[in-house]
UniProtKB/Swiss-Prot annotation:
Keywords: ATP-binding, DNA damage, DNA repair, DNA-binding, Nucleotide-binding. This is DNA mismatch repair protein MutS. It comes from Vibrio atlanticus (strain LGP32). InterPro entries: DNA_mismatch_repair_MutS (IPR005748), DNA_mismatch_repair_MutS-lik_N (IPR007695), DNA_mismatch_repair_MutS/MSH (IPR017261), DNA_mismatch_repair_MutS_C (IPR000432), DNA_mismatch_repair_MutS_clamp (IPR007861), DNA_mismatch_repair_MutS_core (IPR007696), DNA_mismatch_repair_MutS_N (IPR016151), DNA_mismatch_repair_MutS_sf (IPR036187). ATP binds at G613, P614, N615, M616, G617, G618, K619, S620. GO terms for biological process: mismatch repair. The keyword Lyase does not apply.
Length: 853
């Protein structure tokens, strides 16, 4: 007996389909349910909290089964996608009436976290990306695709640190990687990782796939021909998306190179510490995006977040944005634009569903509404003069052909799905109207028949009705059933009534059902044709979506600048940051009392500030606000200050706060030192560096030595623009030794046992740390504070006599260098030229090097 003969025909069909989709859950349509079997059923019952049952047996074993109703499937899919799972949707494609054996079924779509376009499965204001990563000889290729907009990009990060930063910036919902991928730590703690065969990343295959998608002979026109590692990733990505969507992807028309040197680079730690779109707790409250994002459309919100995560260095492009925001602010145009933009809505994702032919009737109705509001938008935009804004207005101009087509084709309030018809408007197609009239005319016929039969037979309880099981029928009460004539054929007996059928009614039933099914078939055909009629306009419609998104972001930033009293920053090529009365954009919004604004001045003669002052005095806020103002200026946004001049910044680094990375077995101090090492290796004179309390996690002398050495290295070797906050007062000596350093401090005033923080930045070093006063504020018992004060007096008396209180007295003989220096062996090895040595000399050299160890 063959193995497959041990299974029923239906289970054989299921197992064949499951073998084609082994890695993902298979939703197998059976009547009104999607069923899952075997391990899929066990997994789904846990993830979705649904009952696990059994269905008969196959191969002698009971089959585990779980199911979800087809009409509620979107909710279950949303939950699975959120958990990083992919699902193959298997539908009945054969006709049950004509099928011998199981109805023919096929997988019609695969829903994956990175390729979903259905509204119910997407976060409205966050990009939904799928990405692919490739690694070779220490370098990376990385490609991302937003299937909901067609935005397809690649880049080539040169280090693992840069790759980690890209992964955090893009936050893909799904990540494809080759089976032999080595830097597996990049994959840690991520949902939606997908292992793919190595051959899918081959360069020739990738180029072939991409040229086929774009209809090109080569990729030179996209400027990506030389990015071989990036193309390997992009090729795998486009193939995977085609496999899962099982349809053409006409909205993906180009591939762009994302060049690192065009952006201000933010590493993973910096994005986390600055709380740009996500706070340290993982939420979205009290983030920069929450303050800045009052956009009218979801697509505008997504664009603003892309700007925030990828600040630009191109000063002319930034000035263009600032000019546009300034003009909108001066005209207060945002008050007119916002209501119109809200009516246009999120057409970007509707267009993606249109391109994938998965749009629903209400998508078409919303697209029609958006088209109706474009003339109103164009009218408002006529007030604008700046070339950037007039060009956006031009791209956002109405497409009359699309408006007219949707107006004629779609009913005013169509149903959710096309399945039961009622979507295509009357007057759009004469044949459809004819069949609909025939079906509608049924009501008149039935009313007339009911009246005639009542009068003819004298049965006043006679009624004509219809249900899905028995079709049309004549119903007579049990008390009058003796009056029915002989040609009435009984169809059903109820408790208080009898139901009959007569030839005229049966003939009418056939005609009505035939006209309804004919009308539905024509309507579905017209629906499919509507996609064909709209697709030629897809590129123009996508340009409209992009332009409207940009207009939304710009009007939003103009409104924020006006409402929150922001100023226009001056962008310059030279390195430096000069801010008058700068404020923290988030903290000032959550404070009850007025925010104390502070200045900062970093220039060629003043590259580093050593910041001292009490805990809770505002050092971290001051540092973060400087970085956030610089970041906002580099997206072309007005900033919270009286005035600001921001030089060209290539990277922003932060070493602020830390916690144990228990999952990776790294202590707080190890995390701190790893981030410090990254800064010391990668910062440049054009970088903005924030260093907060370096060296806290180790002994006093170790910490002081590391902080001192790090500050010296940043000042002398790198010459980066640095804000260096410290509780080591010894570091305030550094400005006396290095001319480009300066001391600033945040002060506090003690009054008895209480303390008042001034939050104002002043020149010079702080006089004391006020640590005991802060401990008192935190609720440390008074007896403990008193004991600590006595101990402090003792230690201060000792330090007056002890030379070790000065950095010069620190014993560094047993300290390892934070900045690696070549050992004696390495220096000797560097001087050896193997090509000049005889075998004997080489052996002698080897012995000599051995002795140096």
């Amino acid at each position: 007996m063959k193995a497959d003969q041990k299974h029923t025909p239906m289970m054989q069909q299921y197992l064949k389909l499951k073998a084609e989709n082994p890695e993902i859950l298979l939703f197998y349509r059976m009547g009104d349910f999607y069923e899952l079997f075997y391990d899929d059923a066990k997994k789904a019952s846990q993830l979705l909290d649904i009952s696990l049952t059994k269905r008969g047996s196959s191969n002698g074993e009971p089959i585990p089964m779980a199911g979800v109703p087809y009409h509620a499937v979107e909710g279950y899919l949303a939950k699975l996608v959120q958990l990083g799972e992919s699902v193959a949707i298997c539908e009945q494609i054969g006709n049950p009436a004509t099928s011998k054996g199981p109805v023919e079924r096929a997988v019609v779509r695969i829903v994956t976290p990175g390729t979903v376009t259905d509204e119910a499965l997407l976060s409205e204001r966050i990009d939904n990306l799928i990405a692919s990563i490739y690694h070779h000889n220490g370098k990376f290729g990385y490609a991302t695709l937003d299937i909901t907009s067609g935005r397809f990009q690649l880049c080539e990060p040169e280090t693992e640190e840069a790759m980690a930063a890209e992964l955090q910036r893009t936050s893909p919902r799904e990540l494809l990687f080759p089976e032999d991928f080595e830097p597996v730590n990049l994959m840690a703690s991520r949902n939606g990782n997908r292992r793919r065969p190595v051959w899918e990343f081959e360069l020739d295959t990738a180029k072939q796939q991409l040229n086929k998608q774009f209809g090109t002979r080569d990729l030179v026109g996209f400027g990506v021909e030389g990015a071989k590692l990036g193309l390997c990733a992009a090729g795998c990505l486009i193939q995977y998306v085609k496999d899962t969507q099982r349809t053409a992807l006409p909205h993906i028309r180009s591939l762009t190179m994302d060049k690192q040197d065009h952006s201000v680079i933010l590493d993973a730690a910096t994005r986390r510490n600055l709380e740009i779109t996500q706070n340290l707790g993982g939420g979205t409250d009290n983030t920069l995006a929450e303050v800045l994002d009052h956009t009218a459309t979801a697509m505008g919100s997504r664009m603003l977040k892309r700007w925030l995560h990828q600040p630009m260095r191109n000063i002319s492009a930034l000035d263009q944005r600032l000019d546009a925001i300034g003009e909108m602010k001066d005209l207060a145009l945002f008050t007119e634009l916002q209501p119109t933009l809200k009516q246009i809505g999120d057409i970007e994702r509707i267009l993606a569903r249109l391109a994938l032919r998965s749009a629903r009737p209400r998508d078409m109705a919303r697209l029609r509404q958006a088209m109706e509001y474009l003339p109103e938008l164009a009218e408002t935009l006529t007030q604008l003069k700046h070339p950037y804004l007039t060009q956006l207005a031009q791209y956002a101009s109405p497409v009359d052909e699309v408006s007219e087509l949707l107006e004629r084709a779609i009913k005013e309030n169509p149903p959710v799905v096309i399945r039961d018809g009622g979507v295509i408007a009357e007057g759009y197609n004469a044949e459809l109207d004819e069949w609909r009239d025939l079906a509608a005319g049924a009501t008149e016929f039935l009313d007339k028949l009911e009246q005639e039969e009542r009068e003819r037979h004298g049965i006043d309880t006679l009624k004509v009705g219809y249900n899905n099981v028995h079709g049309f029928f004549i119903q007579v009460s049990r008390g009058q059933s003796h009056l029915v004539p002989p040609h009435y054929v009984r169809r059903q007996t109820l408790k208080n009534a009898e139901r009959y059928i007569i030839p005229e009614l049966k003939e009418h039933e056939d005609k009505v059902l035939s006209s309804k099914s004919k009308a539905l078939a024509i309507e579905k055909k017209l629906w499919d044709e509507l996609f064909d009629l709209l697709l030629p306009y897809l590129e123009r419609l996508q340009n409209i979506a992009s332009s409207v998104s940009q207009l939304d972001v710009l009007q939003n930033l103009a409104e924020r600048a006006d409402t929150l009293d922001y100023c226009r920053p001056t962008m310059t090529e030279s390195a430096g940051v000069q801010i008058q009365a700068g404020r923290h954009p988030v903290v000032e919004q959550v404070m009850d009392e007025p925010f104390i604004a502070n200045p900062i001045d970093l220039n060629d003669q003043r590259k580093m500030l050593i910041i001292t002052g009490p805990n809770m005095g505002g050092k971290s806020t001051y540092m973060r606000q400087t970085a956030l103002i610089a970041l906002m200026a580099h997206i072309g946004c007005y900033v919270p200050a009286e005035s600001a001049t921001i030089g060209s910044i290539d990277r922003i680094f932060t070493r602020i706060g830390a916690s144990d990375d228990l999952a990776s077995g790294r202590s707080t101090f190890m995390v701190e030192m790893t981030e410090t090492a990254n800064i010391l290796h990668n910062a440049t004179p054009n970088s903005l560096v924030l260093m907060d309390e370096i060296g806290r996690g180790t002994s006093t002398y170790d910490g002081l030595s590391l902080a001192w050495a790090s500050a010296e290295w940043l000042a002398n070797q790198i010459n980066a623009m640095t804000l260096f906050a410290t509780h080591y007062f010894e570091l305030t000596e550094l400005p006396n030794q290095i001319p480009t350093l300066a001391n600033v401090h945040l002060d506090a005033v003690e009054h008895g046992d209480s303390i008042a923080f001034m939050h104002a930045v002043q020149e010079g070093a702080a006089s004391k740390s006020y640590g005991l006063a802060v401990a008192g504020l935190a609720g440390v018992p008074k007896a403990v504070i008193k004991n600590a004060r006595a101990k402090l007096t003792q230690l201060e008396a000792l330090s007056i006599d002890s030379p070790t209180s000065k950095p010069s007295g620190v014993d560094i003989a047993n300290q390892l260098s934070l900045i690696p220096e070549p050992s004696e062996v390495e220096q000797a090895l560097a001087n050896v030229d193997p090509d000049d040595l005889t075998p004997r000399q080489a052996l002698e050299e080897l012995y000599r090097l051995k002795k140096l160890l």
